């Protein structure tokens, strides 16, 4: 059994991460999960949420936007729409996006076609702020 997981995280635009890590956690459609070396093969969808991984004792955090997570042997492949490292997130921009989404949702009913779009925008902004705050605490 390998002691590390080889993680490849890609968006439609670029490879965001290619590292050997000790462990990784993410937010799946059914909740948060973690993977260690030697994990059984696994495939799940990801929702808007946080991905965290530990490498050489240092925890790193990223904000993800929808995708898929696959474990095969000691390789983890993560395919997502967007991914931002904690230190890349503009906290002021995330706060502004949160405010815009909250204001839009106040004016809409759940039956409105735009409601889910703004609901997802609100969730993305909240996750980005949560992840950025973790980078600020370092």
UniProtKB/Swiss-Prot annotation:
Membrane in keyword set: yes
GO molecular function terms listed in the Swiss-Prot or TrEMBL record: ATP binding; proton-transporting ATP synthase activity, rotational mechanism
Leader sequence residues: none
Superkingdom assignment: Bacteria
Family to which this protein belongs: Belongs to the ATPase epsilon chain family.
Subunit-level organization: F-type ATPases have 2 components, CF(1) - the catalytic core - and CF(0) - the membrane proton channel. CF(1) has five subunits: alpha(3), beta(3), gamma(1), delta(1), epsilon(1). CF(0) has three main subunits: a, b and c.
Protein name: ATP synthase epsilon chain
Record lineage: Bacteria, Pseudomonadati, Thermodesulfobacteriota, Desulfuromonadia, Geobacterales
């Amino acid at each position: 059994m390998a002691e590390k997981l080889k993680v490849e995280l890609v968006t439609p635009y670029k490879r965001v991460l290619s590292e050997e890590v000790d462990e990784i956690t993410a937010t799946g459609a059914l909740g948060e999960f973690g993977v260690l070396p030697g994990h059984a093969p696994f495939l799940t969808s990801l929702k808007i949420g946080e991905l965290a991984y530990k490498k050489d004792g240092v925890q790193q955090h990223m904000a993800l936007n929808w995708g898929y997570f696959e474990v095969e042997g000691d390789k983890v492949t993560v395919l997502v729409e967007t991914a931002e490292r904690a230190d890349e997130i503009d906290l002021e921009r995330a706060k502004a996006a949160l405010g815009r989404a909250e204001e839009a949702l106040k004016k809409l009913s759940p039956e409105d076609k735009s409601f889910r779009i703004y609901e997802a925008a609100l969730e993305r902004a909240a996750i980005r702020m949560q992840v950025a705050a973790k980078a600020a605490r370092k």
